[in-house]
Design a protein with these regions (language model features):
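Generic hydrophobic-segment detector
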Residues: 11, 20, 25-30, 38
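N-terminal leader/signal peptides at the extreme start of proteins
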Residues: 1-22
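Active-site-adjacent bridging/hinge elements
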Residues: 35-42
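Sec-dependent, cleavable N-terminal signal peptides
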Residues: 7, 42-43
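Flexible, low-complexity segments enriched in proline/glycine/serine and punctuated by aromatic residues
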Residues: 3, 22, 29-32, 45-53, ...
Length: 256
């Protein structure tokens, strides 16, 4: 006679398997690997962020420099960006004096782009002791993000200093022209009047750049120099600049 056992009695009881865990050596090695990775990440991350920041600033400087040169060459602020970006302008003279145009609270100068270009195009005097030496401006980045152009973000926006020097191109040293005749000298003078050299030095970043207290301002160690030549004549006329009569200059590339 066959006897059937109940199902609960017929089930096989599983045997208890062997338990295993990490040893202290394995745990220590894992912690060491994680710690090494964290140290490597934290050590490289600041360098990577700094490189990214430097690349971004250099990209902005290259784009802004090209725009400024084109504005001076054409005599026109085509995009109308300068009037909202420049907040300090100083014309330095060779005798040590200067003319300063500023606005309160580092606000943009209340000048239209055309007058701004005319002031930036002020030529450097070729005389020894008198005349203009250079033009210095402080400005916020033209090709930065949109949030940097907001009025509330002026203190954190990328800012830099630009020094402009424009002078007639001296292609012939005086010692080579002293023995020339009148016609040849006139031809050389006419050539020099039709060709100008532009040297623009941009330095960044700016620190303590309070426009009403320019003596406290400090400039960083980064710098980029742009050099170009402009062929044509330079037109100038007096105009009203914030209540003062000043000369503004404009290049006309098509006229000689």
């Amino acid at each position: 006679m066959r006897v059937t056992l109940p199902r609960r009695l017929d089930r096989k009881v599983p045997r208890r398997g062997k338990e295993s865990a990490f040893t202290m050596i394995e745990i220590a090695l894992s912690i060491a690997v994680v710690a090494f990775a964290m140290v490597a990440i934290l050590g490289v991350l600041p360098t990577g962020l700094q490189v990214q920041k430097d690349n971004r600033e250099e990209t902005i400087i290259n784009a802004d420099g090209a725009y400024l040169l084109e504005a001076i060459r054409s005599g026109h602020d085509r995009a109308g960006l300068l009037s909202n970006s420049v907040y300090f302008l100083r014309v330095n003279y060779k005798d040590g004096s200067s003319d300063v145009i500023v606005a309160d609270d580092n606000e943009p100068l209340k000048l239209d782009g055309q007058r701004m270009v005319g002031l930036l195009s002020t030529p450097k005097s070729t005389q020894i002791a008198v005349g203009v030496s250079n033009v210095v401006i402080w400005m916020r980045a033209l090709n930065s993000t949109a949030i940097d152009r907001d009025a509330d973000a002026r203190d954190v926006a990328f800012r830099y200093q630009t020094v402009l020097e424009i002078e007639p191109f001296l292609a012939h040293p005086p010692r080579l022209t002293n023995g020339l005749g009148t016609n040849d000298l006139y031809r050389i003078v006419n050539l020099q009047r039709s060709l100008y050299e532009v040297r623009m030095t941009m330095r960044w970043p700016l620190f303590n750049d309070v426009s009403t207290d320019a003596q406290r301002a400090r400039v960083g160690t980064h710098r980029r120099t742009f050099r170009s030549q402009i062929a044509g004549s330079q037109l100038f006329y007096p105009t009203n600049v914030l209540g003062m009569e000043r000369l503004v200059y404009f290049f006309q590339p098509s006229l000689y």
